[in-house]
Amino acid sequence: MKTTFSFLSLFLTLFLNAQDFSTTWLKEVAPRNIGPGGMSGRITSIDVVVSNPNIIYVGTASGGLWKSTSGGVTWNPIFNDQVTASVGSVAIQQSNPDVIWVGTGEGNPRNSLNGGYGIFKSINGGKTWKSMGLKNTRNIHRVIIDPSNPNTVYVAAIGSPWGDHPERGIYKTVNGGKSWKKILYVNPKTGAADLVMDPKNSNKLLAAMWEHKRDPWFFKSGGKGSGLYVSFDGG
């Protein structure tokens, strides 16, 4: 085996020395990315403009929010100037796609979790952003806009996984984010893991509540607070 390896090494050395690997042609080539791929963290949320599917928004765990107007061929970061780079949810107001809501703080309670700073809103397709409150929720997993009344927005805040956290649950605004009301709260150990709206009845909501706690050395999932909740009157 050793003899074979030595022979192959000698052969490759002689072969490479015999070749004329000119790098002159590289002078005419523009700089380019040959890998590895740039990382923006885990993708946590995607939304698409229904009337123009080429416009896509992608939220990431630690790399902010990205926008494509070319159906995904090219991407631009549009959230870099904000206080947090962790996005848990992005929602487009389909009746006016220039209005974008972003819930910050990744909703997946990993040990490498990044915290957020509430919910943000853009009225110009992501060119500028305004903080709309809920800064203490830490981690938002879902934002839902009522298609029949875009001033009504729901937020599922899973909250911090590291301990008791009262700023979690389901929140609702009926005035475009000027004020918020907590409409579902179980206990300080239980956050809103997800929220869905009936597409035929915006007053019907289903919320998945999850009791959990993460520590550096273990993860506790489940408890008395966990369960599925339904509302037929908008919370």
Protein language model annotation of sequence segments:
Residues M1-F21:
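Bacterial Sec-dependent N-terminal signal peptides
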Residues Q19-G235:
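Beta-propeller blade termini and top-face loops
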